[in-house]
Amino acid sequence: MATFKDACFHYRRVTKLNRELLRIGANSVWTPVSTNKIRGWCVECCQLTELTFCHGCSLAHVCQWCIQNKRCFLDNEPHLLKLRTFESPITKEKLQCIIDLYNLLFPINSSIVNKFKKTVKQRKCRNEFDKLWYNQLLLPITLNAAVFKFHSRKVYVFGFYEGSSPCVNLPYKLVNCIDLYDKLLLDQVNFERMSSLPSNLQSIYANKYFKLSRIPSMKLKQIYYSDFSKQNLINKYKFKSRIVLRNFTEFTWDFQLSLHYDLFNNKDKIFAALSTSSLKQFETHDLNLGRVKADVFELGRHCKPNYISSNHWQPASTISQCKWCNVKYAFRDMDWKMESMYNELLSFIQSCYKSNVSVGHCSSIERAYPLVKDVLWHSITKYIDQTIEKLFNVMNPVQVNNQKVISFHWQIDIALYTHIKMILKTERLPFTFTLDQFNSVIKGIVNQWCNVNELDNLPLCTEQTDTLVRLEEEGKLAEEYELLISDSEDDD
């Protein structure tokens, strides 16, 4: 087990390039760090162990040893983890780069075998080529990769992943790319590598190679917002932002293959990039469709629909003395935009409900209560129109000129009054609402702060470092820019 980790340790003194690239955290002094009960393969050292969350992408893919290096596969520093990373689509040229990388850093020939033979002290317990002392020579070249699926974008991190795991809660799945290359050609590459090994090590090498090179691919897993750590989220003035650490260098490569070209033909550029790299901190906004969905679900779970039957004049989120309407605790860490949406939505529904249904107190039990929760839960789904229509129908609409309308004459605060006028694009609010107007107001309140159709699916921490640097230079990392205010806001 952990053949890749052992190979990094023993091969690190072979060449100057190896000394720079093969220094991984798993072979350094251990520093204590909390684990998350997620068992899987660390993509940096490839050992099967308990994982913790990465500082660079907030996903659980690094072990408690490698976390101290703070490396991520999304860095732009050309460290070993970055060199083993490719984005889709995977081509034969990219796979050839991985094979050449292994042959460059972990060569197997007679001189290397003799070098390790001299390194291992030949005593009674070590006088043979035993797996225990020569595990670093048993590193076959396979094309297995841990694949992170960020919706339409896939990132492949190639490595020698030994062992088996149920892969529960892992943000990635293991995929075998041998069919995209050539099985016989890869077999030939490994036969040439093992030809320099002693006979007893050859059998172990071959067994490892055929066992891992022929495993079937797992079904890819879509990464969701729940897969990201909340440990690096900060809450300033009810704005949520995420602290992201990346290894950054001023050197850039236009194409993924150009980095590997420089590795073989322009090593000075690689050394310069490694020696001048630094750890750069980004404070990115956390506004994305995944988080909005999570917040809306929490909003619906904590919602107290009894408010629409009450006579409370205060905003719904500030009610603290009424046992039927108290949700103040739920908004302790909630984003202020969600709180604003909740207040306006329940205040509007309260005004419509009290205008049409005879109800006197928030302790009463009403048919509309489940529908209020459904409006919140479906506010950013395709079922929102059906849910709004159901809520409209329980308010006893009447037929006027072949159109159902509800009355609207209950008190509302001036801010909501102004917002509804802006949504309906009218100078004066009507005393009746049609279904279309009722629908437009609810959707306008939901979309006041962000247009969910334009939001990214995942946090910005999934972007490449070069992208984060460009967004920072353009001033687009802060949430104030990415609020994506709706068009109706501009018409005010």
UniProtKB/Swiss-Prot annotation:
GO molecular function: metal ion binding; RNA binding
Region (Interaction with host IRF3): 318-492
Keyword terms: Host cytoplasm, Host cytoskeleton, Host-virus interaction, Inhibition of host innate immune response by virus, Inhibition of host IRF3 by virus, Inhibition of host IRF7 by virus, Inhibition of host RLR pathway by virus, Interferon antiviral system evasion, Metal-binding, RNA-binding, Viral immunoevasion
Keyword RNA-binding among UniProt keywords: yes
One Pfam short name: Rota_NS53
Location of the region described as Zinc-binding domain in the Swiss-Prot/TrEMBL record: 42-79
Residue stretches in coiled coil: none
Placement of sequence motif pLxIS motif: 483-486
Region feature (RNA-binding): 1-81
Annotated GO CC locations: host cell cytoplasm; host cytoskeleton
Record localization: Host cytoplasm, Host cytoskeleton
UniProt-listed GO biological process terms: symbiont-mediated suppression of host cytoplasmic pattern recognition receptor signaling pathway via inhibition of IRF3 activity; symbiont-mediated suppression of host cytoplasmic pattern recognition receptor signaling pathway via inhibition of IRF7 activity
Region (Important for cytoskeleton localization), start-end ranges: 82-176
Protein family according to the UniProt entry: Belongs to the rotavirus NSP1 family.
Subunit (UniProt): Interacts (via C-terminus) with host IRF3; this interaction leads to IRF3 degradation. Interacts with host IRF7; this interaction leads to IRF7 degradation. Interacts with host CUL1 and CUL3.
Domain comment (free text): The integrity of the zinc-binding domain in NSP1 is important for degradation of host IRF3.
Function statement: Plays a role in the inhibition of host innate immunity by inducing the degradation of key host factors required to activate interferon production such as IRF3, IRF5 or IRF7. Associates with components of cullin RING ligases (CRLs) including CUL1 or CUL3, which are essential multisubunit ubiquitination complexes, to modulate their activities.
Entry-linked HAMAP family: ROTA_NSP1
Protein name: Non-structural protein 1
Organism: Rotavirus A (strain RVA/Rabbit/United States/ALA/XXXX/G3P11[14]) (RV-A)
